[in-house]
UniProtKB/Swiss-Prot annotation:
Catalytic reaction annotation: [protein]-peptidylproline (omega=180) = [protein]-peptidylproline (omega=0); S-ubiquitinyl-[E2 ubiquitin-conjugating enzyme]-L-cysteine + [acceptor protein]-L-lysine = [E2 ubiquitin-conjugating enzyme]-L-cysteine + N(6)-ubiquitinyl-[acceptor protein]-L-lysine
Gene Ontology annotations for the cellular component aspect, listed alphabetically: catalytic step 2 spliceosome
Positions with biased composition (Acidic residues): 484-497, 535-550
Gene (name only): cyp8
Biased composition regions of type Polar residues, renumbered to the chain: 428-446
EC assignment: 2.3.2.27, 5.2.1.8
Domain called U-box: residue spans: 37-110
Basic and acidic residues: compositionally biased ranges: 469-483
Location in the cell: Nucleus
SUPFAM superfamilies listed in its UniProt record: Cyclophilin-like, RING/U-box
CDD domains in alphabetical order: RING-Ubox_PPIL2
Renumbered residue ranges of the record's region Disordered: 215-253, 428-449, 469-570
Source species of the chain: Aspergillus oryzae (strain ATCC 42149 / RIB 40)
Name of the protein in question: Peptidyl-prolyl cis-trans isomerase-like 2
Coiled-coil segments on the chain, per record: none
Length: 570
């Protein structure tokens, strides 16, 4: 303040110094005097938005998986406290919800709020209220997870939110905010990041951008097709009105088939059926609807935990939906737990997924073989490729393998359904440990065994897709409109494969889903040949073809011209 003046000058007001009442406008912007801003417990500590796929660090900081993976790839540290952080340190959280969609304690169903003391168990990832764990586990001396019944210790309890320690959720103390580092989710800052320099983790960002772009393009095509529909002549309008008269005014379900139930035709030709005058579309099951190639474009993410380290995987749902569905469903029901890798060849691949550990067992989630999926751009062109093992055409079950190098001779022989998203080069820790693991020279079996401790699914693309479709149907956004170009192609393809009775036509050498593989002309001959083949191949297990060695060049003998002297004749 000036001499003899009761007013604060401009320089004093703008000053960052804080001295009692003379604190300037910038006095509370940093340091110990920074204003307290609390982050809600259901928000990602990096994007500052509600999380969809929650994971936490051993210290209890919660992030969204799709945000923290690119950050770790670029910075290699915890954005909140600046400590070193790796992908393997992240713990997937399982938070229960009630019917209203609120996060609750899975035992007491008490709603978790910003004032609830919340903890998680390190070995299972289940989230509880502290009161529940203290009363039922600690005081009751029952050191087992109340949901999965797995044993845990006191050191496995991770505090996610403590109302008595408000500084742990204080935004003003977050390291990356104080240092002004880039935050994923802000478009203006993402534009300054070279996505190609992020390596394999940039695939997550590209996938999110591709999904958003595809949605906007579909919306634009739907709008343009609606305008074109209105501009068409009266002939098109009358034809569509006649077609619509056979169907009810209800919105068409998202899983409606391109053919009817056939009840109208059946009741017309049979007096034993109740008459039906409407042509109702048949409904596909959720599995049948989603397992069409190209239907679900979102990628899945999983982690295989082994005794030699963790392997993070990106699953290609768009090009191999059946293989991804099979892998995710088997992993979720614990099929791969304690399963060994029974074959490991250095410079070639490592194979596992057989619970018997012999290479002869294993079955798919359907209990039978499923067909190969070769359509698409995926090739065995790099180290870290994840593919299905088989013993011939359309004989995929539960066994899979991870390539140690490019294997072009396996293209169109084994279905590719994923890739290792960690550093796949020979310098990477886990793949290098697996490749250099000692094996039996005669059987190529690892000694000692390499065991799969667990397979964790971080992102289930089918579950996400189904929830989105059901939400759209509930909100009435799925009303029947003029089909887009993609829908027309799908409808044309289905019309070519389905008769007017709704029976699917099987192509040569293929079997319809859910059909009897032995039906049709020559089924007994095929069964006999199959039995003969089975007897001949009792010693053949599920295998991956090794690269054939090139045939040696034949020596060319230079023939002598003319006749000999007949000296070799008797």
């Amino acid at each position: 303040m000036g001499k003899g003046s009761k007013q604060i000058t401009h320089s004093e007001w703008a000053s960052g110094d804080s001295y009692s009442a003379s604190a300037g406008a910038g006095g509370g912007k940093g340091g110990d005097n920074a204003p307290f801003k609390r982050l809600p417990f259901n928000f990602c500590s990096l994007s500052l938005q509600p999380f969809a796929h929650p994971v936490c660090t051993p210290s209890g900081t919660i992030f969204d998986l799709t945000n923290i993976l690119p950050w770790i790839k670029k910075h290699g540290k915890n954005p909140v406290d600046g400590t070193p952080l790796k992908n393997s340190d992240l713990i997937k959280l399982n938070i229960a919800k009630n019917e209203s969609g609120d996060y609750v304690d899975p035992v007491t169903y008490k709603v978790l709020t910003d004032n609830t003391h919340i903890v998680a168990l390190r070995n299972t990832g289940n989230v509880f209220a502290w009161d529940t764990v203290e009363r039922l586990n600690i005081k009751g001396k029952l050191w087992r997870d109340l949901v999965t019944d797995e044993e845990f210790g006191r050191k496995d309890i991770i505090t996610l939110q403590d109302p008595q320690n408000i500084e742990s959720r204080n935004l003003s103390s977050f390291n990356y905010l104080k240092e002004g580092e880039s935050v994923p989710g802000q478009k203006e800052e993402e534009s300054n990041v070279n996505a190609s320099a992020l390596g394999s983790s940039a695939k997550i960002l590209k996938a999110k951008e591709a999904v958003a772009k595809a949605r906007s393009e579909r919306a634009q095509r739907a709008d343009s097709s609606a305008v074109t529909k209105k501009a068409d002549g009266s002939t098109t309008t009358s034809t569509q009105s006649k077609t619509a008269s056979f169907q009810s005014g209800k919105p068409t379900p998202y899983n409606a088939a391109k053919y009817t139930t056939g009840m109208a035709a059946a009741s017309f030709t049979s007096t034993g059926l109740t008459p039906h005058t409407s042509a109702e579309l048949a409904l596909l099951s959720d599995e049948e609807y989603m397992l069409k190639r190209g239907r679900v474009k979102q990628k899945g993410y999983a982690r295989i935990s082994t005794t030699s380290g963790d392997i993070n995987l990106e699953l290609q749902t768009e090009y191999a939906p059946k293989a991804v569905w099979n892998f995710i469903k088997l992993a979720k029901k614990g099929y791969y737990k304690d399963v060994t890798f029974h074959r490991n060849i250095k410079g070639f691949m490592i194979q596992g997924g057989d619970p018997s550990g012999t290479g002869r067992g294993g079955e798919s989630i359907w209990g039978k073989y499923f067909n190969d999926e070769f359509e698409g751009p995926l090739k065995h062109d790099s180290r870290g490729t994840l593919s299905m093992a088989n013993k011939g055409k359309n004989t995929n079950s539960s066994q899979f393998f991870i390539a140690y190098r490019a294997l072009p001779h396996l293209n169109n022989k084994h279905t590719i359904f994923g890739h290792v998203i960690d550093d796949p080069t020979p310098s990477s820790t886990t793949l290098n440990n697996l490749e250099t693991h000692p094996v039996n020279s005669s059987t190529n079996r690892p000694t000692p065994d390499i065991r799969i401790t667990d397979v964790t699914i971080f992102v289930d693309p089918f579950e996400e897709f189904l929830n989105q479709k059901k939400a759209e149907e509930a909100s009435g956004k799925n009303k029947k409109v003029d089909p887009t170009e993609e829908d027309r192609e799908t409808q044309q393809e289905d019309d070519d494969q389905v008769t007017w009775t709704g029976k699917r036509v099987r192509g040569p050498g293929s079997t319809a889903a859910g059909g009897d593989a032995g039906s049709g002309v020559g089924k007994y001959l095929k069964a006999a040949l199959a039995n003969q083949t089975t007897q001949e191949e009792d010693e053949i297990v599920e295998f991956v073809d090794e690269e054939p060695e090139p045939e040696p060049m034949r020596k060319k003998f230079k023939s002598r011209g003319g006749f000999g002297d007949f000296s070799s004749w008797d």
